[in-house]
Amino acid sequence: FEGEEVFVEKTPFGVKAWVTIPPCGAVTLVPYKKKNVEQKAVSAEKTTDGIALENSQVRVKINKKGEVTSFVLKESGREFAADALNCFHFYKDVPRMFDAWDIDSNYREQELEGAFDVCTELVADGIEAVIKVTGKIGNSSYTQYIRLAKDSRRLEFDTTIDWKELHRLLKTSFPVAVYAENGINEMQFGYVMRPTHRSREYEKDRFEVCNHRYSALCDASHGAAVLNDCKYGISMNQNALELTLLRAAAAPEMRADNQVHHFTYAFTAWEGDFAGCDVVKQGYELNEKPRLVPGCVPTFSMASVKSGTVVLDTIKPALDRSGDLILRLYESKKAAGKAQILLNVDAKKAWLCDMLENKEQEIVIKDGMLELEFGAFQIQTIRLSIEEAMA
């Protein structure tokens, strides 16, 4: 695009390209005959124990059950797998009340046989290595594609399950080599911290908590996280993150959950403290995939943010149909500081607003840029007047 050759490869899943897309923007790709053959960006090798994957960031080993037995960051050589990651746990699940709502704490005492008849197969490498895993759990069958992309520290588990259970609970466990007394669970515009232990009586009822795009365990030197695109229940038990994948309630509808389910979750790790990691960005990337449409436009970016922790979450038209644009930003890591918002629209004026988009304070646009102070977890809404530019 824009005269630059990009890494493109035909795979069993279609043509894939490695492209840098500007924030809140677009690029145009045109066909081009490749002159030079590049080395594989992700190598994959079959071993006696399973399959080994490696790119510029990580080395990963996956056994014949589709479990991750090793996840090493190459920058430090640190091993993050305390035990097998992506290990399925299958439980009997019969709540005393509210069948489709509650999970009782005694489910751990009723574990059943997990995955069986598991087969693994290497189906692609190059721009992205892909391992296909098939198997059975109870009366159900599943297919999982484990993906590691070029220059990525995110190992994705693209999963489809034909769920045929009743009163059953399925989790996947990620025991990591991180000591943390509290785990981090993302919520709307921030996160909450919850204990990973059960030392106090009231914490025994926190065996299942909610999260949005990620949950993380970290100390002052390193950390790891489980990301997801649609699964919001998770357990944090000592050093293990256990994501709830599926349940099978009998009420109010006997077989409401018996269907084919598709979802993706992922594992990532980093060196350094939580404030400096990119787990929020990784969570957005997993959930907000690029959209492909036919057409041709110059490369552009509507707006971007210069800050390690402030996120531009929303760009939308104003509710009053005035033609103004609304930008909503938030501080994501409990780290107060300044943020520069670079605007690539011809905005004439800008205001800080309340959440209902009512103007509160005019702010100065200087050289196409706004500069704002953010408190920890602060949400700020900006209104841009672009009427003259559009006229």
Regions found by a protein language model. Name each.
Residues 1-391:
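C-terminal (or distal) subdomains of carbohydrate-active enzymes
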